[in-house]
């Protein structure tokens, strides 16, 4: 094989390089355009596009609810916070049984989420789509999302059935 001398390069390599550069010059602006406009291609968005908005009903004085909302946002959810005067009344109106009560109740698609439920559990619920009212983490266990602690305690996420009975959905 001949070394890349001036004539060999001009005759065999340069024409291919020119075609390659021209093709890239035409393709790159089109590929970059969605990013410049602030949108992300559907293949990149993936499952985040399918996540429903989380509507959270909470007391105006509760700070941990905001931390839980931030946890959800970091995991791809859009969250709307609604301050209510009576959280238990909002919970009852939405349809979550009182015995699973916590500091906030949320609606996520067709489901209710009570308390500091991890985002991964909500995503699993939305993927599996069981016949249920939703998920609950009763009370406010230290170490749950929004209740971060140096001394976390084990807790369960409960799947609340339409009959009001619950079973363990996940252990943390």
PLM features: what roles do these ranges have?
Residues 69-89:
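Conserved helix-turn-beta segment immediately C-terminal to the redox Cys motif
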Residues 15-29:
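Bacterial N-terminal signal peptides
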Residues 47-69, 75:
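Local sequence-structure signature of Cys/Sec-based thiol-disulfide redox active-site neighborhoods
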Residues 51, 77-78, 131-133:
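Loop/turn elements at helix/coil->beta-strand transitions in domains of secreted/extracellular proteins
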